[in-house]
């Protein structure tokens, strides 16, 4: 079956209709076979609320991760009987009735390790195995071992894992890559989608959809067999993201799908629940109370949906960058998400062809082509000269430049002339001494200036290289690696995020202290080390001078700073 010509839109519409009906069936099948564990705020009701509001623990995630020692209903009944008694001690009650998460052992690396040796030594430290969990544990079991980010993040996270897996592959740990792909496929088969992380309280949302890219990565080692093996799960994930599309009218939205007035289909981030997040309970309640002009449930949904984006939180989602309570994630069509959906459609087409289903391959290709046109039409700001998010309320592309603008280049969805403009905008507005800024706005949120994040550095580097912008790509990698190296030289750690306004300093902002470990930084650092150093002369540390330079970029001086405690 040949893909219909672009000049005949009436037939193009028939193909998506057919394919979406198939996906609707897949989605229903996933829901019917799934077992959905209840999150702790539902299991424990008023007890959960009271413990979190009492701020018994510095990190609210601690109690969200605590395991009840008996049936939650029995614990709740005991609490109701005891809570008004004289001398009742809530902390003692929690200690008796729950097993609190243990602090991970402090990893002390051997003296004299290079950056590469340190990362290679961290893989077993960050590996977890949870084939079985306690009945009421919020942790969801997975059949294979997996690598966690580190620090307070004791579970596997969806989009983090892709960049971690890049590093595992670079280290030759293809068995771990295969294990993690198998785990995510298991989650799709069990829950109908890949949750934010393997916790019951993350099941109501997903994260940036990298599963198809993970399968594509595994196919580099296993060939088309990997594509064919995981085609059913990729189709199910696509069904999850497109759930509800068959009933949409022009100008409507349903869950994660948006249908614009001209019929263009795009996606947004969404969480199925509209309550405070268990892992950030008190903070979310305070945010909602701080804006009485909006329904609390609306704010909760937008907070949760921002967590689904991975960018929690950023001025990108807010009307007022200084007020988190003005975020409205669900009314924004993100450029990075739709780039990933385009890539998913392209990989689904490739996998279908590998499986011998050329008709289905053509249908996915048609969907990818339509989405690419939508990206170019709605997610490009011609006045500013960069890709940006689309605002469903104003019906306009937004003006803000963020590092997400590089995603169309990363997935090869950008027009060549626009890629050139993106290179100029990136170098002019986002490139800093220590890497790529997330945005140019200083809001105090962690996904804003001056923070830089490893996954965004890699997306920008690869995206610019895809379009021949090698000098800007090399500048980004070199600046970020220098930052990582300077921090490592002083702290002997790799950080979750970095201050890119200088070098040698971890990032700030956000709802929790800076975390070290750190899965995706490890992965991106290895990829960048192998990018800037020739294969015949691999480097274990960042070189003192910028390799392969055709620009005037000079080695960066290390910032004098005190070690973080």
From Swiss-Prot:
Assigned EC number: 3.2.1.28
Keyword Hydrolase attached: yes
InterPro entries named among the record's database cross-references: 6-hairpin_glycosidase_sf, 6hp_glycosidase-like_sf, Glyco_hydro_37, Glyco_hydro_37_CS, Trehalase_periplasmic
Reaction it catalyzes: alpha,alpha-trehalose + H2O = alpha-D-glucose + beta-D-glucose
Superkingdom in the source lineage: Bacteria
GO biological process: cellular hyperosmotic response; trehalose catabolic process
Location of this chain's protein in the cell: Periplasm
Regions that span the bilayer: none
The UniProt record lists the keyword Signal: yes
Disulfide cysteine pairs (residue numbers): none
Binding residues annotated for substrate, in chain numbering: 152, 159-160, 196, 205-207, 277-279, 310, 511
Pfam families in UniProt: Trehalase (PF01204)
MF terms (GO), sorted A to Z: alpha,alpha-trehalase activity
GO cellular component, one term: periplasmic space
UniProt-annotated catalytic positions: 312, 496
Signal peptide start and end residues: 1-30
Keywords attached to this entry: Glycosidase, Hydrolase, Periplasm, Signal
Region named Disordered: 538-565
Its biological purpose: Provides the cells with the ability to utilize trehalose at high osmolarity by splitting it into glucose molecules that can subsequently be taken up by the phosphotransferase-mediated uptake system.
Quaternary structure, from the entry: Monomer.
Alphabetized HAMAP family for the sequence: Peripl_trehalase (MF_01060)
Family to which this protein belongs: Belongs to the glycosyl hydrolase 37 family.
PANTHER family to which the protein is assigned, alphabetical: TREHALASE
Protein's name according to its UniProt entry: Periplasmic trehalase
Species annotation: Escherichia coli O127:H6 (strain E2348/69 / EPEC)
Gene name of the record: treA
């Amino acid at each position: 079956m040949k893909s219909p010509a672009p000049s005949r839109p009436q037939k193009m519409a028939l193909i998506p209709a057919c394919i979406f009906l198939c996906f609707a069936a897949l989605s229903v099948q996933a829901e019917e076979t799934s077992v959905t564990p209840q999150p702790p705020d539902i299991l424990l009701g008023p007890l959960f609320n009271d413990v979190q509001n009492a701020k018994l623990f510095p990190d609210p995630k601690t109690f969200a991760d605590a395991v009840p020692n008996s049936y939650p209903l029995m614990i709740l009944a005991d609490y109701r009987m005891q809570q008004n008694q004289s001398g009742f001690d809530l902390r003692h009650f929690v200690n008796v009735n729950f097993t609190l998460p243990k602090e991970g052992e402090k990893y002390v690396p051997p003296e004299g390790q290079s950056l590469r040796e340190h990362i290679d030594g961290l893989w077993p430290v960050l590996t977890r195995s949870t084939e079985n969990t306690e009945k009421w544990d919020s942790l969801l079991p997975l059949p294979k071992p997996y690598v966690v980010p580190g620090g307070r993040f004791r579970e596997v996270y969806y989009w983090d894992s892709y960049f971690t897996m890049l590093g595992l592959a670079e280290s030759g740990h293809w068995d771990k890559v295969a294990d993690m792909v198998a785990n995510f496929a298991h989650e799709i088969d069990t829950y109908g989608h890949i949750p934010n992380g393997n916790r019951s309280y993350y099941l109501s949302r997903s994260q940036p959809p990298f599963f198809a890219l993970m399968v594509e990565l595994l196919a580099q080692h296993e060939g088309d067999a990997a594509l064919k093996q995981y085609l059913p799960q990729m189709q199910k994930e696509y069904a999850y993201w497109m759930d509800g599309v068959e009933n949409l009218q022009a100008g409507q939205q349903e869950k994660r799908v948006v249908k614009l007035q001209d019929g263009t289909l795009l996606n947004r981030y969404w969480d199925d629940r509209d309550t405070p997040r268990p892992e950030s309970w008190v903070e979310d309640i305070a945010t909602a109370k701080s804006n009485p002009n909006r329904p609390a449930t609306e704010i909760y949904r937008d907070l949760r949906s921002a967590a689904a984006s991975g960018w929690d939180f950023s001025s990108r989602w807010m009307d007022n960058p200084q007020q988190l309570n003005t975020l409205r994630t669900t009314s924004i069509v993100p450029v990075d998400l739709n780039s990933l959906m385009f890539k998913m459609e392209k990989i689904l087409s490739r996998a279908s062809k590998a499986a011998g289903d050329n008709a289905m391959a053509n249908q996915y290709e048609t969907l990818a082509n339509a989405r690419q046109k939508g990206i170019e039409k709605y997610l490009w700001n011609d006045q500013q000269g960069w890709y940006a998010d689309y605002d469903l309320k104003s019906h306009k592309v937004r003006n803000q430049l963020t590092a997400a603008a590089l995603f169309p280049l990363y997935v090869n969805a950008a027009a060549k002339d626009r890629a050139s403009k993106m290179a100029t905008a990136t170098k002019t507005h986002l490139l800093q001494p220590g890497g790529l800024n997330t945005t140019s706005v200083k809001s105090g949120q962690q996904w804003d200036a001056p923070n830089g994040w490893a996954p965004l550095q890699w997306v920008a580097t690869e995206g610019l290289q895809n379009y021949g912008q090698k000098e800007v790509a090399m500048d980004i990698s070199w600046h970020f690696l220098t930052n990582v190296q300077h921090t490592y030289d002083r702290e002997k750690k790799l950080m979750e995020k970095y201050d890119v306004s200088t070098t040698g300093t971890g990032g700030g902002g956000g709802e929790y202290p800076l975390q070290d470990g750190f899965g995706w930084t490890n992965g991106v650092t290895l990829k960048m080390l192998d990018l800037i150093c020739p294969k015949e002369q691999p480097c274990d540390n960042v070189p003192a001078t910028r390799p392969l330079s055709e620009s005037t970029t000079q080695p960066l001086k290390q910032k004098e700073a005190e070690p973080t405690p």
